[in-house]
UniProtKB/Swiss-Prot annotation:
The keyword Cytoplasm does not apply. This is Zinc finger protein 18. May be involved in transcriptional regulation. Belongs to the krueppel C2H2-type zinc-finger protein family. Signal peptide: none annotated. Keywords: DNA-binding, Metal-binding, Nucleus, Repeat, Transcription, Transcription regulation, Zinc, Zinc-finger. It comes from the Eukaryota. One of its GO terms (cellular component) is nucleus. Residues 41-123 form the SCAN box domain. SMART domains: KRAB (SM00349), SCAN (SM00431), ZnF_C2H2 (SM00355). A zinc finger (C2H2-type) spans 408-430, 436-458, 464-486, 492-514, 520-542.
Amino acid sequence: MPVDLGQALGLLPSLAKAEDSQFSESDAALQEELSSPETARQLFRQFRYQVMSGPHETLKQLRKLCFQWLQPEVHTKEQILEILMLEQFLTILPGEIQMWVRKQCPGSGEEAVTLVESLKGDPQRLWQWISIQVLGQDILSEKMESPSCQVGEVEPHLEVVPQELGLENSSSGPGELLSHIVKEESDTEAELALAASQPARLEERLIRDQDLGASLLPAAPQEQWRQLDSTQKEQYWDLMLETYGKMVSGAGISHPKSDLTNSIEFGEELAGIYLHVNEKIPRPTCIGDRQENDKENLNLENHRDQELLHASCQASGEVPSQASLRGFFTEDEPGCFGEGENLPEALQNIQDEGTGEQLSPQERISEKQLGQHLPNPHSGEMSTMWLEEKRETSQKGQPRAPMAQKLPTCRECGKTFYRNSQLIFHQRTHTGETYFQCTICKKAFLRSSDFVKHQRTHTGEKPCKCDYCGKGFSDFSGLRHHEKIHTGEKPYKCPICEKSFIQRSNFNRHQRVHTGEKPYKCSHCGKSFSWSSSLDKHQRSHLGKKPFQ
């Protein structure tokens, strides 16, 4: 039965006392280390089931970690609810904002909201924090992941030099740009020196980004930021996130990805500053909402399973989506191409899952082309078809092996079908399964349409009326055959005697006159007949029946 939340929270202090009595001396030492709420929260959320411990011991350990985090003996019910609401609010934030807000250690949901809203007015703080993460990720991450969040702790202030990130400066416009010189405080000089001593790998990857031709968008001073209108601020915000994506990929934080040869050139003007960017990575787009969200873990802190990019459009997981934060502050998400819109040619390729190989639009197979390779569905000879279309690999240029696609096949008789629904319906003929049974004569039918037609024989309903004579019919097929009498239409013409027929069945029977085909054979004497009615009459002679007495 459901338990009231207030009652459940009211039981926490008593359970905590019962568990405290079982704590050992080693648990007391552990409790001192878990004094930080953030550390206790991470231990609780990252706790995994231990097979060796068993379910009872695992539940006991999980309860202890929950008490360490929520502290029911100290916090009230309202405070515990506030902690849970704050955690959930931080979890649903976009990844870049989430990491920054967590580092500020907000004490309530209102404080977290204030921090998020402050980023819209001054994104420079988030930009500088991102720069610190990229430049000193190996060294500074240890300090940023310290178990306790002290009130007086201030992160070092860094301004990023574009040359050090392997990105070229853009030409400055009317609004003079701030020079991005790395200003280090005394307590971070040694740390960044150590980070630079690893170099080669980091610096080599950063210099390689010079091919992108991207320039770091500078952090505008407050007076310059206030002069921008809403559109320019949104452009500034998007370009900042785009540059952040290049920094992250250049610093080796994002997961590896196959090389893309397509290049998109675009220029944007912001506050008199012209930025010309050459990208080797396509800008985030989505095609008809069919492209699923790509998830990327930047590993900037040890939070488990952080989904950093919640935007609906991603470009193969390399660059964080420009709309990941823009969509958070605004209602629309630009960059999505709907139906009927022209997509850039660089984004027309279909990428195979897990291989990074691409297919050109010409290699997509339409249903019509696919049907030309399908075997006869009722031949029973073939259940696997091979498509002869070969797709070439983007890197090696070697043709792939032909792609096999299995068709639904009946295990009883071996018939092959195009769709699973056809196979399921066919299997009823073997099992004798019937879905629709007449309540009057108890006759059963497989199809609902046949069942409806049969019911009309009992009710006398004839909903299909002839427009010429007003005669009624129970179904449309009978009406169509009748209308051909009025129109004189005889679509089935014998190629031998040129006699025409209204119905196909009559045409087929007539053809047996010319071909001499006799498909109906008597099981007693072996005599064959062209029509089933002739066979019925003949069989009565063997049985000695006289139908007319």
